[in-house]
């Protein structure tokens, strides 16, 4: 049976591609600064795959990813569309992706931060998850953050619809 050490898992998580950093999620949402960055990586990847990639489509998402990697993850150096054959302003596209991705990452991280699952069962903030007040509080926070994420996502959808004229890029 193959076992991974905690260090192996941390190393593998840090090698996953993300368009934003855990620090950016913390700065732009209500996620506390003391939350371990490693625990936010998987929620960022999940948010990219569930909420951003379907809007952009595989081709446009992969193009953004490739350009982001090419400029050493510095969004200020992304192409502005004047020098590329597809005429896409990747810098502006990144700016439109940034906030929805931060907020969806925050929502995906809430369960990681708020709920502990171990051999004793499911615990919510150190007590039984079945306590209604705490579960209701979690749901209230989750719903509020979801509305914010959906609002930013709607803006991204409008931007893509209005500016991406080559619909083949959205496939």
Regions found by a protein language model. Give the residues of each.
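Conserved short "hinge" loops at termini or chain/domain junctions
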Residues: 1-98, 112-171
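Catalytic-loop motifs flanking and including active-site residues across diverse enzymes
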Residues: 101
């Amino acid at each position: 049976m193959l076992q991974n050490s905690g260090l192996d898992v941390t190393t593998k998580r840090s090698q996953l591609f993300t368009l934003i950093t855990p620090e950016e999620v913390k700065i732009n949402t209500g996620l506390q600064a003391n939350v371990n960055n490693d625990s936010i990586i998987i929620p960022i990847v999940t948010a990219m795959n569930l909420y951003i990639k379907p809007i952009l489509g595989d081709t446009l998402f992969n193009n953004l990813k490739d350009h982001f990697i090419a400029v050493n993850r510095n969004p200020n150096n992304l192409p502005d569309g004047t020098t590329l054959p597809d005429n896409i302003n990747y810098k502006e596209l990144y700016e439109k992706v940034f906030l929805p991705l931060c907020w969806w990452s925050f929502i995906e991280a809430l369960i990681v931060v708020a709920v502990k699952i171990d051999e004793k069962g499911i615990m919510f903030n150190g007590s039984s998850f079945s306590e209604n007040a705490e579960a209701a509080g979690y749901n209230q926070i989750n719903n509020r953050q979801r509305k914010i994420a959906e609002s930013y996502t709607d803006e991204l959808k409008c931007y893509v619809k209005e500016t991406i004229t080559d619909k083949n890029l959205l496939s």
